[in-house]
């Protein structure tokens, strides 16, 4: 499978899983009426609308702010898609696909509802992590894969596999 196809499939899969999960939690499971749902002493499913980006940074409280975030997200997706189109390494393509799919999932939320739907909340004692969704997880996984590639690529002194998996 070529890097482009792999990245495209990863983006599609991340987008579909994210949107299906959000639709199911909101419209079928009715998380808004049930929240919070404790799955473990350290993990809850809750329902939050985030008008900003990670950690609620750059909260878009106005319509103009919302559309600026949408435009910046779509521009980033365009740049990442160009990078994916040129990628010759499957790990990089997979990483970019995850980031693109996650970014598209959150962009759809912001366009349709003005904010991103977040559900997953980890906490231990007084420590708590931010509330996130599957799109956020895909973006983080993609960034982690890019970091892995940076440390294992030819530039780092280790031959990277080509599109057939040969070093």
Curated annotation (Swiss-Prot):
PROSITE patterns attached to this UniProt entry: SPASE_II
Compartmental location: Cell inner membrane
EC number: 3.4.23.36
One Gene Ontology term of the molecular function aspect: aspartic-type endopeptidase activity
Key words of the record: Aspartyl protease, Cell inner membrane, Cell membrane, Hydrolase, Membrane, Protease, Transmembrane, Transmembrane helix
Record InterPro entries: Peptidase_A8
Amino-acid biosynthesis listed as a keyword: no
GO CC terms of this entry: plasma membrane
Pathway per the UniProt entry: Protein modification; lipoprotein biosynthesis (signal peptide cleavage)
Ranges that cross the membrane: 67-87, 91-111, 127-147
Residue numbers annotated as active site: 118, 136
Membrane topology: Multi-pass membrane protein
Superkingdom of origin organism: Bacteria
Pfam family, one: Peptidase_A8
Family: Belongs to the peptidase A8 family.
Protein name: Lipoprotein signal peptidase
